[in-house]
């Protein structure tokens, strides 16, 4: 969310007409050497009176600090006192206090680029920079986390990044969130991380939910690593889907016809289409540079999205569930999401996954996507950072489900004991062992991964809305999507 700062005209005792555009802002504090300071997810800025722009003071991750629950004060000598929280899913927040002063850092720099780094990624970089004696990760973001960004600004940022890469200015480490992993992989820009894992004496694949690595893999190579994952899926009551192992779009359509237009929770036509575009790779062959958005299968998907679009215009909204909901789309971040729905369906809960033709279709949503540049001259150092994502200690601080089995067991046991940071989701505060087992089965059975390509998604949704509004038929919209998507894909090859 973006913010503006308004000041008070003390003569008129009214708001000043001039306002300062702050952009995404996580905190605002008065200063000594500056009139005030503000910070976003990555940088602290200082502002002089009347200035429209602040000057960067320091980067949080450079200092080894996260931006969760930050309190800040400036001393008269220019030093800063910072109190910052450190997260762990099994306990309440703990705090660290740091006194920051200017100094030299002689460690070797590892460059890292992100379009918009999540708080979890910033924390991972901060933790590494706080503890590693040899290397320091220097994180550059195009946009702070949660800043409002137009499609044009986003596309221009991707063009700028790709231009830098073409000119040889490739960072050592890439945050692949919001970038097309398939395109970067097909161009040979990303290291295969399987050999790094195999030669690391402290990492054993069997300690993890290995299906996560398999889902991420492309052509037998591992383009990035994550530390945690959520599961995108659909669920319903046992009586509604008895005998089904997964479902097709046609079967999901019957739910709407049988139980009413507003019977699927957390789903609109546009969101359904976006979810399927991110998870169903059958419409694009990146190796051949071809797509099939004019196929009967995609037209049917578009028609179903239109039916949901009509129903969602009069839906219940918010996150509260009504007795009218026969099914729901859910992103399972913790065991408490399972607990909540199990109670709603009186224990008769079935996870069928997203609609597809091959049985249960559960999708992994990685918490982070961190890859190593194939052209980096500091691959050893880059791996020093990337490997920290796999450590049990680090994964205890993830906000999603850890993919390390021991970390998973510890955070889910905390949920059973009522000591998880996620207790606010479920008012009773405790999950059951059955909830834990179902969560584990769900994570262990997910065989697909969510892939982002915001430019392509925006293009497709723009044309889909023409169908939703009645301006075009589903077939006409699909043909226009096919034409524009083909052009975009050819430009990327």
Spans of model-derived segments:
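Repeated scaffold domains used in trafficking and secretory/extracellular systems
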Residues: 21-33, 65-75
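Extracytoplasmic/periplasmic substrate-binding proteins
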Residues: 48, 303-384, 409, 413
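Short, well-ordered beta-strand elements
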Residues: 105-118, 135-142, 173
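Helix-loop-helix "hinge/cap" segment bordering the ligand-binding cleft or interdomain interface
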Residues: 197, 214-316, 374-380, 472-476
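A bilobed periplasmic-binding-protein/Venus flytrap-type ligand-binding module shared by bacterial periplasmic
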Residues: 234-240, 363-378, 397-400, 404
């Amino acid at each position: 969310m973006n913010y503006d700062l308004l000041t008070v005209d003390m003569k008129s005792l009214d708001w000043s007409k001039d306002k300062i555009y702050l952009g995404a802002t996580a905190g605002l504090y008065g200063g000594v050497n500056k009139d005030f300071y503000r910070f976003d997810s990555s940088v602290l800025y200082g502002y002089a009176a009347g200035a429209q722009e602040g000057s960067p003071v320091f980067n949080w991750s450079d200092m080894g600090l996260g931006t969760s629950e930050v309190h800040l004060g400036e001393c008269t000598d220019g030093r800063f006192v910072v109190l910052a929280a450190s997260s762990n899913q099994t306990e309440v927040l703990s705090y660290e206090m740091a006194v920051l002063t200017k100094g030299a850092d002689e460690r070797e720099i590892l460059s890292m680029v992100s379009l918009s780094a999540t708080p979890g990624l910033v924390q991972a970089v901060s933790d590494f920079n706080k503890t590693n004696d040899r290397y320091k990760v220097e994180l550059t973001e195009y946009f702070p986390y949660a800043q409002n960004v137009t499609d044009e600004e986003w596309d221009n940022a991707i063009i700028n990044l790709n231009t830098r890469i073409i000119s040889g200015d490739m960072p050592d480490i890439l945050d692949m969130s919001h970038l097309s992993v398939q395109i970067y992989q097909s161009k040979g820009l990303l290291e295969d991380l399987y050999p790094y894992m195999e030669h690391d004496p402290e990492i054993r694949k069997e300690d993890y939910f290995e299906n996560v690595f398999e889902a991420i893999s492309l052509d037998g190579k591992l383009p990035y690593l994550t530390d945690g994952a959520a599961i995108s899926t659909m669920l319903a009551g046992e009586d509604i889907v008895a005998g089904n192992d997964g479902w097709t779009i046609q079967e999901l359509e019957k739910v709407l016809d049988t139980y009413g237009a507003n019977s699927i929770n957390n789903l609109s036509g546009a969101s359904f289409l976006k979810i399927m575009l991110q998870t169903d790779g059958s419409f694009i062959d990146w190796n051949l540079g071809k797509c099939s958005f004019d196929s009967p299968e995609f037209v049917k998907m578009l028609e179903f999205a239109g039916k949901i679009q009509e129903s969602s215009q009069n839906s219940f909204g918010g996150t509260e569930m009504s007795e009218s909901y026969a099914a729901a789309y859910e992103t399972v971040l913790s065991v408490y999401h399972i607990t909540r729905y199990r109670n709603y369906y009186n224990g008769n809960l079935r996870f069928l996954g997203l609609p597809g033709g091959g049985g249960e279709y559960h999708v992994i949503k990685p918490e982070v996507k961190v890859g190593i540049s194939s052209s980096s001259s500091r691959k050893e150092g880059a791996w020093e950072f990337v490997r920290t994502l796999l450590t049990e200690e680090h994964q205890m601080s993830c906000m999603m489900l850890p993919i390390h089995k021991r970390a998973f067991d510890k955070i889910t046991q905390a949920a059973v004991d009522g000591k998880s940071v996620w207790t606010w989701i479920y008012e009773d505060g405790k999950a059951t062992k059955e909830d834990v087992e179902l969560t584990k089965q769900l994570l262990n059975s997910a065989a697909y991964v969510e892939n982002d390509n915001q430019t392509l998604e925006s293009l497709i949704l723009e044309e889909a809305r023409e169908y939703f509004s009645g301006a075009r038929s589903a077939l006409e919209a699909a043909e226009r999507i096919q034409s524009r998507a083909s052009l975009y894909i050819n430009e990327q090859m």
